[in-house]
Amino acid sequence: MSETTLNAAEQPIDELVSWVKQHDFSLNLTTERLAFLIAIAVLSNERFDEELGEGELHDAFTIVTRLFEETGEASAFRANNAINELVKQRLISRFTSEMTEGASIYRLSPLAIGITDYYVRHREFSKLRLSIQLSMVAGEMAKAIEAAKQGGTAGHWKKNVYAVLKYSVGEIFDQIDLNQRVMDEQQQSVKQQIADLLNKDWREAINNCESLLSETSNTLKELQDTLQAAGDELQTQILDIQELVYGDEELEFIEETLFGLQMKLDRITSWGQQAIDLWIGYDRHVHKFIRTAIDMDKNRIFSTRLRQSVKDYFDMPWYLTYADAERLSDLRDEALVLRDDEVTGQVPLEVEYEEFQQVNDELAERIGEMLRLHKDNGKPIDLGIVLKDYLAQHPSTHHFDLARIVIDQAVRMGYSESDYQAIQPDWQAINDYGAKVQANVIDRY
């Protein structure tokens, strides 16, 4: 949390609400108005004094209006209305002086800079940019450590240590945090692109989806490696300063600042691994969807490709390569009776000749009745809990077969909403012999 947010949080909410109401703050930016504001920001950055005249604002409005033909012509009247709207919303400030012979000059307000900065300057989050920011932080931390080792008066600590930590290091940490949030949005954008591709034509979209997934995965891994390497160094620097001020009550404000920096550093470094874990889950979800689509449509797609290949053979000749390998032997006999090594003695005549399939059907029916109670009562099915309770009632030698039947019956009952959100479930132990299951709670029937 930035210092500005901390200061705001210290004020009662009703006072802040009254302040907003008293000053009549409001924002209403249509797409055209936002484009106009961004155009003003771009032009301002090209000026040394970052000031624009009214004529330059009219020129910017004309450029924007060309791309928004449906809104009307770029008349001076409409341009003045747009400028006045931005002034009223405190997005640009208007000044008039004798030096400009009565003509107005305009500057972006801090609010406008924040808005345009988000859209213009924070759209690219690369490894190079992150490396530069982390190098700057390390340099500022080195200055603070050097000043702390020298020691001195309270004024020395406030000026050369506290100020560097709070305003230099803290601000760069906030900037990195903001860039990471932009990267989160970019991931959402990539997910939307993949969804659009799969909805249009998943057969043609497979290669594009794979490219988008791999590119994002590689970017996240590079960023995480950079964060991990720099994070260890920054952690050491924070601990060095903490050791120098430990136990000194007069320097307690330094310890509080270091505590805040430690929280920011932990959040920044943990972001990378969390982003990778979430993306891996989404990657698996997409591949599972594609495999399912291929299984459902494999005959049509393969036959279509084969016919097309034969048709185009003379224009684009091809070679057919095939492999003829021996089939693998299935060592599991489907006619085996469920094992029960814990039972000794003579098998009753009525079950002596029962085959596995018959036993399986009876078990499936009983398990289905057990799970149907969840469906009738509208309760979710947590397979981890259900399996653990059910398997505890049976010998360990039956656990594998029984767990498979329970899961098979459960997925027929319904599905989990979390599967469609690419949420990766945790592994849960289901018996005392190390068996685990990974499944989301079934909450839709």
UniProtKB/Swiss-Prot annotation:
GO cellular component entries: cytoplasm; nucleoid
One Gene Ontology MF term: calcium ion binding
InterPro entries: Chromosome_partition_MukF (IPR005582), MukF_C (IPR033441), MukF_C_sf (IPR038198), MukF_M (IPR033440), MukF_M_sp (IPR036141), MukF_WHTH (IPR033439), WH-like_DNA-bd_sf (IPR036388), WH_DNA-bd_sf (IPR036390)
Cell compartments where the protein resides: Cytoplasm, Nucleoid
SUPFAM superfamilies: MukF C-terminal domain-like, Winged helix' DNA-binding domain
CDD domains the UniProt entry points to: MukF_C, MukF_N
A Pfam match: MukF_C
GO BP annotations listed: cell division; chromosome condensation; chromosome segregation; DNA replication
Record carries keyword Cell cycle: yes
Top-level taxon: Bacteria
Region (Leucine-zipper): 213-241
Sorted UniProt keywords: Calcium, Cell cycle, Cell division, Chromosome partition, Cytoplasm, DNA condensation
UniProt similarity note: Belongs to the MukF family.
Physiological role: Involved in chromosome condensation, segregation and cell cycle progression. May participate in facilitating chromosome segregation by condensation DNA from both sides of a centrally located replisome during cell division. Not required for mini-F plasmid partitioning. Probably acts via its interaction with MukB and MukE. Overexpression results in anucleate cells. It has a calcium binding activity.
NCBIfam families documented for this protein: PRK05260.1
Subunit structure: Interacts, and probably forms a ternary complex, with MukE and MukB via its C-terminal region. The complex formation is stimulated by calcium or magnesium. It is required for an interaction between MukE and MukB.
Protein name, as recorded: Chromosome partition protein MukF
Gene (name only): mukF
